[in-house]
Amino acid sequence: GDKLILTKPLGAGIINTAIKADLVSERAREAVLKSMKTLNKYACEILKKYTIHACTDITGFGLGGHGTEMAAGSDKTLVIDSQALPIFPDVEEYASMGLIPGGAYRNREFAAKTGYVSTAKLWLEDLVFDPQTSGGLLAAVPAEEADEILGELKELSLPCAVIGEVIDRKKHTLLIR
C-alpha cells in the first residue's frame, strides 16, 4: 500500500488556543507563525515530480477530517502512526492542559460518522483532529518512492514525515495507532 507523507507539523489549532489564553511559549508561537507563512507550493513542486495517488491540504477539518474524506473517497483505510506525526513545540503540554479548540471536537464527531478507531494517547488523538491554519499537504505515495520524496522535502528544510499508510478498506476509514 501507499505511504502517507505529511509536509508540516500538527498542532496549530492547539497553539492558537494557547495564544488566546496567553499561555503560549515564544518558541511555540514562532514555530507556528513560521509554518503558517510557509507556502505549500514548495512541497507541491516536489510532489508533482512523483506518483501521487491522492493529496489534500490539512486545514480546518484537521488530519482526521481530511484523512477520513480521502479514505472514504478512495474506498481505503488510512492507518495513522501517532508516534510519527511532526508536532509543533509544547503541543503535548497545551493539550494536556485542555487547550483544545472546539473545532477538534467537531472534527472528531465528523470522523466518527464514517468510523475511526484509536489506540493512541488521548492528546495525540486530539492532535489528529486539531484544526490547522495553513496546514501541510497529506499525500498518498507509492511506498517505493516515499524515501526519495522525503529526502527532497527535507532538503528544503520542510519538517515532513511518513505518518502512516493506506490499506484496503476495513470497517473503519481511519485507524490511529
Where are these regions (language model features)?
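Helix-biased detector of long, well-ordered alpha-helical tracts
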Residues: 2-177
